[in-house]
């Protein structure tokens, strides 16, 4: 990534815009400049990943097969099945193969659902293949000459048209690729790709088959991941699997380990938990628990939206009178101003405490959720900003500015989006974080980045005229440099915490 | 309706010529893909003495996909639910086009002899089968007497 603006005059330029009065408290947490970890780059360049097209993936697959075959010297289709069995981990395959080569070869091939290629054809197979009279196909019950029949090394033979139909059904209807087994009942020997291609004449089915085996290659290979962006057909290949920021040729940036949008500083597992939490209705039920009670008589769920504690159930068949506080019948409360004599009973107190706890955990969740969603929505708007910024840049070039001079605007939007995204995920991180001294520094960093980001966003929405142009440019540049720097500081701090175990989690 | 594939015609013929003991499958007069099936409860099983009615249908892409089979007679069995649906591997992912109506019905008969409560379809039945097999077997006998024995 480019880091051409790492000039460090950001600190003093910032004091310039404090005077513009939009960020009140700027006693931010600069004390994060701790020793160590300065050498740690957030975007290290030593992570050499590649973006591959579908053709390149197929090519890559072939290279792996050839590489392994230099050592195994088996046929290509068999090597392919073996590799697929070992999830395309060639080291593991070779290790197992040479480990077990003497006495357990049989077992090795059996596990991979291949007939041992070193076996001599069994008597049965030989007999069947050398037979000259007609055979009955066990699928269509037709009597056919031997040249219309075929089968795998396992010796189960069916007619060509049944094979064709069988394979087509498996590929098209069931979406199977590398894992289609022999058509005989109970036989788990796999059909290799060359045989499939030979037996299936339909070009469309062949294409589908190719897609399926390429897909399973990418899916089970730990060093490959499809770009999760809609309609993108690229895959990313990495030197080792880790949560890293990868940038697809289509423009999408994502985390290699989990496939979500790049989510630094929060870790994959917390983000996964968070997304699940946001997706399922667990919070809906929390809300119901926190805000409603059940009628003690008919159990209908009631939300109390005001009024006194004398409840009359609205269920027409029930109409029960009860006290909202103790859930007891209203009668003993008497006609005097409500005075719930059971209010302090242990049971009632426990129920109240439980409800209180749910309520506060809901409030806590909503606090983080709202901020998370807010940045996510803003980020969507910022994407629109690119279009308007492009227009602005053209206008400015008409005002006698050169192309290079107006590039700062695009850069500003880039940084704005980057900051929004980071901020968004800081709320997920913070949600699971237990409070301690470091978490408070983190929150200060977060607050500071957030207010700077909002200011930058505001600047970018202002109209730019030829009069204020120079001024705006200065302000925008100062601000984005500041934002960028604060973002780096925040991430560095969190990473340092990961390295030195500062962070405690709530779950 | 498209003409009946050779496979189905042949299979039906053979089924009629060489019937399997304890199993009877007759195609419907109006639909050659629909079979009226009768399976007798295997000896030494709680279903002994019972006569179970089933229906069997060969879908359009048979034999590439498995026949659809369902018990019509009520039966107390951990792998058969209230609607008579059967949990059996060869009717699902272990189906092979080289299997036939005959082999499938034999598998079903075998399932009656060897219920598998670890892979249940009827959860309550399977549960009882595991915690109190004697009582489950008693229930199965009762149901057999009640629903599968004609007076």
Swiss-Prot record, chain B:
PROSITE patterns the record matches: UBC_1 (PS00183), UBC_2 (PS50127)
Top-level EC class: transferase
Reactions the enzyme catalyzes: S-ubiquitinyl-[E1 ubiquitin-activating enzyme]-L-cysteine + [E2 ubiquitin-conjugating enzyme]-L-cysteine = [E1 ubiquitin-activating enzyme]-L-cysteine + S-ubiquitinyl-[E2 ubiquitin-conjugating enzyme]-L-cysteine
GO cellular component: cytosol; nucleus; perinuclear region of cytoplasm; UBC13-MMS2 complex
Disruption phenotype: Mutants in this gene exhibit several, largely neuronal defects including lesions affecting the neuronal connectivity of the giant fiber with the 'jumping muscle', and the axons of photoreceptor cells R7 and R8 fail to make the proper right-angle turn into the medulla (hence the term 'bendless').
CDD domains from the UniProt entry: UBCc_UBE2N (cd23813)
EC number assigned by the record: 2.3.2.23
UniProt keyword annotation of Cell wall biogenesis/degradation present: no
Entry keyword set: ATP-binding, Nucleotide-binding, Transferase, Ubl conjugation pathway
GO MF terms held by the record: ATP binding; ubiquitin conjugating enzyme activity; ubiquitin conjugating enzyme binding; ubiquitin protein ligase binding
Active site, per annotation: 87
Pfam families according to UniProt: UQ_con
Residue ranges annotated for the UBC core domain, each copy included: 3-149
UniProt GO BP: axon target recognition; axonogenesis; flight behavior; grooming behavior; jump response; peptidoglycan recognition protein signaling pathway; photoreceptor cell morphogenesis; positive regulation of JNK cascade
Annotated pathway: Protein modification; protein ubiquitination
Function: Catalyzes the covalent attachment of ubiquitin to other proteins.
Family that this chain belongs to: Belongs to the ubiquitin-conjugating enzyme family.
PANTHER family: UBIQUITIN-CONJUGATING ENZYME E2
Protein name: Ubiquitin-conjugating enzyme E2 N
Source organism: Drosophila melanogaster (Fruit fly)
Gene: ben
């Amino acid at each position: 990534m480019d880091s051409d603006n790492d000039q460090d005059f950001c600190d003093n330029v910032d004091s310039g815009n404090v005077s513009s009065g939009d960020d009140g408290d700027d006693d931010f947490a600069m004390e994060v400049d701790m020793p160590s970890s300065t050498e740690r780059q957030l975007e290290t360049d030593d992570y050499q990943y590649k973006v591959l097209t579908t053709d390149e993936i197929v090519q890559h697959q072939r290279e792996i097969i050839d590489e392994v075959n230099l050592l195994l010297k088996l046929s290509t289709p068999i090597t392919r099945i073996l590799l697929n069995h070992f999830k395309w981990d060639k080291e593991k395959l070779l290790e197992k193969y040479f480990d077990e080569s003497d006495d357990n070869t049989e077992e090795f091939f059996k596990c991979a659902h291949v007939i041992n290629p070193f076996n001599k054809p069994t008597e049965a197979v030989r007999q069947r293949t050398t037979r000259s009279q007609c055979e009955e196909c066990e699928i269509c019950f037709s009597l056919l000459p031997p040249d219309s029949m075929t089968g795998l090394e396992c010796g189960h033979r069916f007619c060509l048209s049944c094979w064709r139909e069988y394979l087509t059904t498996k590929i098209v209807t069931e979406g199977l690729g590398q894992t289609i087994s022999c058509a005989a009942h109970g036989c788990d020997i796999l059909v290799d790709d060359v045989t499939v291609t030979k037996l299936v004449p339909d070009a469309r089915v062949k294409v589908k088959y190719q897609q399926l085996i390429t897909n399973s290659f990418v899916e089970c290979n730990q060093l490959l991941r499809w770009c999760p962006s809609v309609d993108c057909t690229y895959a990313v290949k990495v030197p080792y699997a880790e949560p890293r920021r990868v940038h697809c040729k289509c423009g999408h940036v994502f985390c290699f380990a989990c496939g979500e949008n790049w989510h630094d500083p929060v870790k994959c597992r917390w983000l996964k938990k968070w997304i699940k939490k946001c997706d399922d209705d667990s919070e809906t039920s929390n809300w119901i628990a926190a805000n409603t009670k059940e009628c003690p008589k008919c159990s209908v769920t009631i939300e109390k939206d005001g009024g006194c504690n004398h409840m009359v159930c609205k269920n027409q068949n029930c109409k029960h009178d009860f006290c909202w506080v103790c859930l007891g019948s209203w009668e003993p409360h008497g006609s005097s101003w409500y005075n719930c004599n059971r209010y302090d009973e242990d049971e009632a107190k426990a129920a109240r405490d439980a409800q209180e706890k749910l309520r506060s955990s809901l409030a806590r969740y909503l606090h983080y959720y709202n901020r998370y969603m807010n940045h996510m929505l803003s980020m969507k708007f910022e994407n629109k900003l690119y279009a308007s910024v492009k227009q602005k840049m053209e206008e400015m070039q008409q005002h006698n500015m050169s192309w290079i001079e107006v590039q700062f605007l695009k850069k500003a939007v880039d940084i704005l989006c980057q900051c929004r995204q980071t901020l968004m995920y800081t709320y997920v991180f913070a949600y699971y974080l237990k409070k301690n001294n470091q978490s408070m520094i983190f929150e200060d960093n977060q607050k500071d980045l957030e207010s700077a980001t909002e200011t930058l966003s505001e600047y970018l929405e202002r109209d730019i005229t030829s009069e204020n142009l120079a001024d705006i440019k200065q302000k925008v540049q100062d601000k984005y440099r500041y934002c960028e720097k604060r973002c780096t500081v925040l991430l560095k701090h969190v990473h340092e915490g990961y390295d030195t175990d500062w962070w405690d989690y709530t779950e | 309706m498209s003409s009946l594939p050779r496979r189905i015609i042949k299979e039906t013929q053979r089924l009629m010529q060489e019937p399997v003991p304890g199993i009877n499958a007759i195609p419907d007069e109006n639909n050659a893909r629909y079979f009226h099936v009768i399976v007798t409860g295997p000896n030494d099983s709680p279903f002994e003495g019972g006569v179970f009615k089933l229906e069997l249908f060969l879908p359009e892409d048979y034999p590439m996909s498995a026949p659809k089979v369902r018990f019509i007679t009520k039966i107390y069995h951990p792998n058969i639910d209230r609607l008579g649906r059967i949990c059996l591997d060869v009717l699902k992912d272990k189906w092979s086009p080289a299997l036939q109506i005959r082999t499938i019905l034999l598998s079903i008969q075998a399932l009656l002899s060897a219920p598998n409560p670890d892979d249940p379809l009827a959860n309550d039945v399977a549960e009882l089968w595991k915690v109190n097999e004697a009582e489950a077997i008693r229930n199965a006998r009762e149901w057999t007497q009640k629903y599968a024995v004609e007076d």
